[in-house]
Amino acid sequence: MLEGGFILLHRSILRWEWYGDLNTARLFIHLLLTVNYEPQRWQGIAVERGQRVASLAKLADETGLTVKQVRTALEHLKRTGEVTHTATSKYGLFTVNHYDRYQPRGEPEGPRPGMENGIQGAGGGQAKGSNGRK
């Protein structure tokens, strides 16, 4: 599983129809975090950007959901077109449809926080500590 990097998560997700369904939202965000951000190969098959190979049991283990909860959440995401799942006897291929809409290539659009806008964030050790001093 990827341990570095980040994903973009637009605030419009707050208005998404599945946002209030914790299991479905959790699975979708987990897939956004774990699908390939660039094409890879796995055991002789091409796994494209926005895809990953996993089983329902693996996703359940990674998310803390039960297999039944993952299956139900996946059905929600498939029904509304966010995710496609192709199952074989050996693996499952999960695809976040329209991945580039969620995670565009290149630099994000819009204003950027931090020094480019004249705002300097706190560096390491500069956050307010428990002693009340900066």
Label each region the model flagged.
Residues 9, 24, 66-69, 110, ...:
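Intrinsically disordered, low-complexity sequence elements enriched in Ser/Thr/Gly/Pro
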Residues 1-17, 33, 37, 47, ...:
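An N-terminal low-complexity regulatory-tail signal and nearby short nucleic-acid-interaction modules
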Residues 12, 24, 43, 105-108:
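A generic structural signal for solvent-exposed, polar alpha-helical segments
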Residues 27-31:
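Short alpha-helical "packing" element that flanks the helix-turn-helix/winged-helix DNA-binding module
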Residues 17-18, 116:
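Short, surface-exposed loop and linker segments with low hydrophobicity and enrichment for Pro/Ser/Thr
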Residues 5, 11, 93-94, 117:
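Residue-level marker of intrinsically disordered, low-complexity segments enriched
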Residues 98-134:
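Charged low-complexity intrinsically disordered patches
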Residues 18, 22, 35-97:
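Winged helix-turn-helix DNA-binding recognition segment
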